[in-house]
Amino acid sequence: MLTRRLVVCLDVKGGRVVKGVQFEGLRDVGDPVELARRYEAEGADELTFLDISASAEERDTLWELVRRTAEQLFIPLAVGGGVRTVDDVGRALRAGADKVSINSAAVANPALLTACAERFGAQCVVASIDAKRDGDRWRVYTHGGRKPTDLDAVAWARECVARGAGEVLLTSIDRDGARTGYDLALTRAVSEAVDVPVIASGGAGSAAHVRAAFQEGGADAALVAGILHDGVTTVGAIKALLRESGLHIRSLT
């Protein structure tokens, strides 16, 4: 039976965890290492660091942060944001990341996914896709959701996997931070189109929304952030509901 995963996302800027709505209006929510340890203790299956500053000046700060966090964690740590080259991926993995998500750089140069998969293995390469509803399809955006492309999200997900991505992190820009639930139609469309795990992201407002991502969206994993940072719910409460609903998840014991 498929074990579903609960992934906690920490958006990092200037060495701190921040949160906003639709990638805007950021506020400070805490120290990354402390929050990572807390969420692991609560039962998170995986952690994702997204460097949303993506500035060269702060890149060294990020690697040091990854190193400090990875030393404290036993669960997998994924890192993304501003990853542009094979060397960037190598640096993240050497700092202690288990996986690296690639977004804008893959759109600019799709061969980067193949190069990274060949060098480090597909299991280390996550295609991060930010998508926004556009009529009867979803358009891919880059640069933190600011720059529209001509790519269709479902077709792009297929291409990313064909080029070597071992996982897809799929974020609905429309739902990001809105807490109205994941975009289940988008999640299902991509989940049905690829044969690698899909992480649903953007819109979690309750444990029931997470359950819907699995049961209705067909996701393999669900990413949560703001509702945990703000104490709306807990990892334990989400997992309890998933377990009651018959979904197979990892327990703390």
UniProtKB/Swiss-Prot annotation:
Q: Biological process (GO) annotations?
A: L-histidine biosynthetic process
- Molecular function terms, GO-annotated: imidazoleglycerol-phosphate synthase activity; lyase activity
Q: Name one GO cellular component term.
A: cytoplasm
Keyword Lyase attributed? yes
Q: Which domain of life is it from?
A: Bacteria
Q: Please name the pathway.
A: Amino-acid biosynthesis; L-histidine biosynthesis; L-histidine from 5-phospho-alpha-D-ribose 1-diphosphate: step 5/9
Subunit and partners: Heterodimer of HisH and HisF.
- Protein name per the record: Imidazole glycerol phosphate synthase subunit HisF
